Structures are given as structure tokens and as C-alpha cells.
Amino acid sequence: ATSALTLVAAQFEQLPEDVQTANVRKVLTFDRSYEYAVLDLPPALTKLTEKVITLSDSVFVPIELGTFAIQGIPAVTGALANCNAKFGGCIVNKFDKENPADTELLEFLKCTLGNKVLNTTIPFSRVIKNSFSYKLTAKEYMKWTAAAQAYEDLAAEIIERLGEE
């Protein structure tokens, strides 16, 4: 899947600027019966991600706690500012509450970014990894797990935050 995403991004980069923008606008034009659209992009600042960010109202950045990931946040928020996109916040992903390092890094992140760190954390879970193999959401695969419930809570928190804007 990663090599396929790389190929798509590489092909996108070869398109003329106006065609890139038109294609991204098409993707972002969705059925108006929906209030929100979530686009999951590769974790790289390519022209594709920059175009999508530029045309988005708010951007939430998932982060797996680790020193390098936290050190990369200023680059991401700087890129968002350059695209005039609103930084909705960080979503802590693959969080292990039993790991003292994760707990310390979460506290550091909260001290650094304050309310830009969402309260909902997505726990590390094999269920999520396994659900991808079956092309199911975590909720469809095993709806009673903590990870599946965390995604429900995350959606509610994001909707609440966007409603406050």
C-alpha cells in the first residue's frame, strides 16, 4: 500500500499546477448531505498533501509518540501556516498507557501545545492492524474494543471542536 501511495504522489507531482488544483478540488467536492469529510494522507509534505491542506478548513495531525515525531511538529505546523490552514490539533495515535515513556511524552506534548492536543488518544491495538487486512474498520472488525471506542470518541471530539470554531 505504501508503494502505491508513493506512486500516486509521484504521478500527481508530474501534473501541471492547475490540473493538480482542479483534481484536488474534485476530491474535496463531496455530497453536501455530509457536514465533514476526513482525508487520510500519507505522512509526508508532498505537493499532494500541500494542495489538500490548502483547500481544507481544518487539519488534525495524527502523531505516534516518539522523540522524532514530537521534534517534527514545528515543521508540520509551519507548513500549515504557509498554506493558511487552521491547525485543529494533534491526535495521539498508538498510545500505550502502560509505557512510562508514552505517558511522559504525552504530558510534554500537552505542555507544549496545550489544548491543541486532543483529549482522546487512540490506544495501540492489533485489532486495528488486523482490521486493515480484512478491509474493515476497527468498529466493523471488533466493535467492543477500546481502540474502536476511541475512534468513536475521537470523531465526537473533532465534531465538537469544529462546532466551536
Stretch-by-stretch model annotation:
Residues 29-126:
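Conserved catalytic-core segment of NTP-binding enzymes
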Residues 10-15, 100, 139-143:
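Acidic, proline/glycine-rich intrinsically disordered inter-domain spacer in sigma factors
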